[in-house]
């Protein structure tokens, strides 16, 4: 079964991030440019029926578009992953990540982690944190999120989007016209 995760795609930012990483000493094995994404929620393995239910739940999610400033580097020691991410991030990002993680939990998916650290993994098998390069300075304009599956091939792991949704605010309820007092009075006289 494939492993699933929700993420923000980086179609225009991925080439810039890869070029920035490749111009400096960076620990570990580089993540291919095509696999770069900002993780929202890791879900783990899921069968096709669970994938379909997850897609239906995610399609109901509302979140307005937002911006994220990627301005620091970091390292997950246990995962041996070196990354770039924001020092601060908008509440919309936290709310979206939490909601998507809960959708997975409803279906028995996820790893139960409650903390969220937005990041873009730039390398794996990193035995140390990135050095002190000039701080990253990238702006991510998030306008959609996707459900991906991880596919192992002879050339390595590739991430394939199963479904993507635009970020959009919750629609405002339609205003109902107030009943006309005169019309009500006339109705009452009949």
Predicted features along the sequence, with ranges:
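Histidine-dependent nucleotide/RNA phosphoesterase domain, centered on the 2H-phosphoesterase fold
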Residues: 1-190
């Amino acid at each position: 079964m494939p492993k699933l995760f929700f993420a923000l795609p980086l179609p225009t930012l991925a080439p810039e991030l890869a070029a920035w990483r490749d111009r400096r000493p960076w620990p570990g094995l580089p993540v291919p440019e095509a696999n770069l994404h900002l993780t929202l929620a890791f879900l783990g393995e899921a069968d096709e029926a669970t994938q379909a239910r997850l897609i239906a739940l995610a399609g109901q999610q509302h979140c307005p578009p937002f911006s994220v400033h990627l301005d620091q580097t970091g390292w997950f020691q246990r995962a041996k992953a070196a990354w770039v991410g924001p020092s601060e991030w908008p509440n919309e990002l936290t709310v979206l990540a939490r909601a998507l993680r809960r959708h997975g939990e409803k279906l028995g998916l996820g790893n139960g982690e409650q903390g969220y650290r937005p990041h873009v993994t730039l390398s794996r098998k990193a035995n140390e944190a990135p050095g002190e390069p000039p701080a990253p300075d990238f702006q991510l304009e998030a306008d959609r999120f996707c459900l991906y599956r991880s596919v192992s091939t002879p050339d390595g792991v590739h991430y394939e989007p199963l479904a993507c949704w635009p970020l959009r605010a919750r629609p405002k309820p339609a205003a109902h016209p107030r009943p006309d007092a005169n019309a009500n009075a006339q109705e009452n006289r009949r």
